[in-house]
C-alpha cells in the first residue's frame, strides 16, 4: 500500500509518500511545495493544486492522508491553511483517491505513542520507522511522513478489526 501524507500550508505544504510491503515501511519520496509570498492567493492555491496533481499522477498512491488544522490564535493563518486543505482534498477527490484526515494528536499518538510529543521526538520516530539515515527535512516533509505513517497504522488496525469481526461472525 502506498500512502501520500500531506501537511497543508499556503507558503509550504509538506508531502511524504511511503510504501508498506511485507510488514516493512519505506519512504519513496518526500519534500515540500513552496509558493512565493508575492503571488496572489488564488495563484498560490493553483500552484499547490498543480504540484499535488503531478505527484498523484506520478506515484499513484492508494490513499492520501491529510493533517487537520490545529487551533491557532491567528485566524488569518487558520483561514489560509483551510484554503490549502480545500485544494488538497479536492485534488485527491478529483483523482479518485480516498482521503483520510488526522489531528496532530492522532499523528503523535500513532508515531510516538504520546499525544503531547515534541516535534523532535516525532521526527526521530519517523526516521527510525522508515529506516532513514538522517532526520527527514524540512519539518513540513517530516510532518507529512508522520501523517502517512499514522494512516498506515490506522488502516492496518481497521483491517485487522474487520478481519477479526468477520472471523467471529463465521464461528457463530
Swiss-Prot record:
<dbReference type="GO" id="GO:0006310">
    <property type="term" value="P:DNA recombination"/>
</dbReference>
<feature type="binding site">
    <location>
        <position position="67"/>
    </location>
    <ligand>
        <name>Mg(2+) 2</name>
    </ligand>
</feature>
<dbReference type="GO" id="GO:0000287">
    <property type="term" value="F:magnesium ion binding"/>
</dbReference>
<keyword id="KW-0540">Nuclease</keyword>
<dbReference type="InterPro" id="IPR036397">
    <property type="entry name" value="RNaseH_sf"/>
</dbReference>
<feature type="active site">
    <location>
        <position position="7"/>
    </location>
</feature>
<dbReference type="GO" id="GO:0008821">
    <property type="term" value="F:crossover junction DNA endonuclease activity"/>
</dbReference>
<keyword id="KW-0378">Hydrolase</keyword>
<feature type="active site">
    <location>
        <position position="140"/>
    </location>
</feature>
<dbReference type="Pfam" id="PF02075">
    <property type="entry name" value="RuvC"/>
</dbReference>
<dbReference type="InterPro" id="IPR012337">
    <property type="entry name" value="RNaseH-like_sf"/>
</dbReference>
<dbReference type="GO" id="GO:0005737">
    <property type="term" value="C:cytoplasm"/>
</dbReference>
<keyword id="KW-0233">DNA recombination</keyword>
<dbReference type="InterPro" id="IPR020563">
    <property type="entry name" value="X-over_junc_endoDNase_Mg_BS"/>
</dbReference>
<comment type="similarity">
    <text>Belongs to the RuvC family.</text>
</comment>
<comment type="function">
    <text>The RuvA-RuvB-RuvC complex processes Holliday junction (HJ) DNA during genetic recombination and DNA repair. Endonuclease that resolves HJ intermediates. Cleaves cruciform DNA by making single-stranded nicks across the HJ at symmetrical positions within the homologous arms, yielding a 5'-phosphate and a 3'-hydroxyl group; requires a central core of homology in the junction. The consensus cleavage sequence is 5'-(A/T)TT(C/G)-3'. Cleavage occurs on the 3'-side of the TT dinucleotide at the point of strand exchange.</text>
</comment>
<keyword id="KW-0460">Magnesium</keyword>
<comment type="subunit">
    <text>Homodimer which binds Holliday junction (HJ) DNA. The HJ becomes 2-fold symmetrical on binding to RuvC with unstacked arms; it has a different conformation from HJ DNA in complex with RuvA. In the full resolvosome a probable DNA-RuvA(4)-RuvB(12)-RuvC(2) complex forms which resolves the HJ.</text>
</comment>
<dbReference type="GO" id="GO:0003677">
    <property type="term" value="F:DNA binding"/>
</dbReference>
<feature type="active site">
    <location>
        <position position="67"/>
    </location>
</feature>
<keyword id="KW-0238">DNA-binding</keyword>
<dbReference type="GO" id="GO:0048476">
    <property type="term" value="C:Holliday junction resolvase complex"/>
</dbReference>
<feature type="binding site">
    <location>
        <position position="140"/>
    </location>
    <ligand>
        <name>Mg(2+) 1</name>
    </ligand>
</feature>
<keyword id="KW-0227">DNA damage</keyword>
<dbReference type="InterPro" id="IPR002176">
    <property type="entry name" value="X-over_junc_endoDNase_RuvC"/>
</dbReference>
<protein>
    <recommendedName>
        <fullName>Crossover junction endodeoxyribonuclease RuvC</fullName>
        <ecNumber>3.1.21.10</ecNumber>
    </recommendedName>
</protein>
<dbReference type="GO" id="GO:0006281">
    <property type="term" value="P:DNA repair"/>
</dbReference>
<keyword id="KW-0255">Endonuclease</keyword>
<feature type="binding site">
    <location>
        <position position="7"/>
    </location>
    <ligand>
        <name>Mg(2+) 1</name>
    </ligand>
</feature>
<keyword id="KW-0963">Cytoplasm</keyword>
<keyword id="KW-0234">DNA repair</keyword>
<keyword id="KW-0479">Metal-binding</keyword>
